[in-house]
């Protein structure tokens, strides 16, 4: 099994954009909520509910060049993974994002493309 698709949006993390609700609980920001809602439109394989071990490779192309000398902004790859995994669960691509299903995220990285930010996703079954 191999699924490939592209989410043509600037990648957004979930944790770094959170706001506190009235009860003090961390809530996703409007920026993340918009990202999730829009990303769902670009996922072609909704509701397949993968429940076997898979590798989710994600190449994140961002508007900001985090590797440019002097750039003080940073982005956390793990937070990008968390946001993507949550989107995939919401879309029904993955049954859950626990380690029994998302076995690995090998090959993932952050790159720069100011004119065409996106996330290229490849999901492949892992033989244990």
Regions found by a protein language model. Name each.
Residues 1-128:
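Acidic, proline/glycine-enriched N-terminal capping motif
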